[in-house]
């Protein structure tokens, strides 16, 4: 039943790839010693009675390696944007200058670097668990397909082995991304 093999496995490979991509996106929001516009991507602002991403109420730019500027489009939103940035767990202190907020990026202390490395480790572990859950779902579907006589027992075992290889590959990519991010965080 080679016709069912490819779509089934590619569906789970796609889900595992999305887990790795989600981790890299989460890592983008972790602060390192340098300014990055993606640092503020996870911040939501209370605007017009609802919570909106910062990028929908302001333009974020990086004019210098250790400075982020946020140009708020609506003057009435400046206080809300400042509050959202201060309340984020990024440890940033914006300076208001009219409709612009200047956010100096202070160098990270050794303690803060270690905390960020732990947070990165937690993010990576969450995605490892997600990949393992995807593997579990794939194996359950394969067992069900074998039970329903859609695939043979030999095909089920072969495909389970392939799912395990995909899982190992995804976890390896997660571990590599974590190692890279930890090195980036710990760099002075």
UniProtKB/Swiss-Prot annotation:
Subcellular location: Cytoplasm
GO cellular component terms given for this protein: cytosol
Keywords: Cytoplasm, Protein biosynthesis
InterPro entries found in the cross-reference section: Ribosome_recyc_fac, Ribosome_recyc_fac_dom, RRF_sf
Entries under HAMAP family matching the protein: RRF (MF_00040)
Job of this protein: Responsible for the release of ribosomes from messenger RNA at the termination of protein biosynthesis. May increase the efficiency of translation by recycling ribosomes from one round of translation to another.
Family label: Belongs to the RRF family.
Gene3D superfamilies the record matches: 3.30.1360.40, Ribosome-recycling factor
Keyword check for Protein biosynthesis: yes
Pfam families documented for this protein: RRF
Name of the molecule in the record: Ribosome-recycling factor
Primary localization class, coarse: cytoplasm
GO biological process terms on file: cytoplasmic translational termination
Gene Ontology terms, MF aspect: ribosomal large subunit binding
Lineage: Bacteria, Pseudomonadati, Pseudomonadota, Alphaproteobacteria, Caulobacterales
């Amino acid at each position: 039943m080679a016709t069912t093999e490819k779509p089934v496995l590619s569906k789970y490979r796609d889900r595992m790839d999305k887990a790795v991509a989600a981790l890299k996106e989460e890592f983008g929001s972790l602060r390192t010693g340098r300014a990055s516009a993606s640092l503020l991507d996870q911040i939501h602002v209370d605007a017009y009675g609802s919570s909106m991403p910062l990028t929908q109420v302001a333009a974020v730019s990086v004019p210098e390696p250790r400075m982020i500027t946020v140009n708020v489009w609506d003057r009435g939103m400046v206080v809300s944007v400042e509050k959202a940035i201060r309340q984020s767990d990024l440890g940033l202190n914006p300076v208001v200058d009219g409709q612009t907020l200047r956010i100096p990026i202070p160098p990270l202390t050794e303690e803060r670097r270690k905390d960020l490395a732990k947070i990165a480790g937690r993010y990576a572990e969450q995605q490892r668990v997600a990949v393992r859950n995807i593997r579990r779902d794939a194996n359950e579907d394969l067992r069900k397909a074998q039970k329903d006589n859609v695939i043979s027992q030999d095909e089920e075992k072969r495909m389970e082995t392939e799912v395990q290889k995909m899982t190992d590959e995804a976890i390896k990519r997660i571990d590599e991304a974590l190692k890279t991010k930890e090195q980036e965080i710990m760099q002075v």
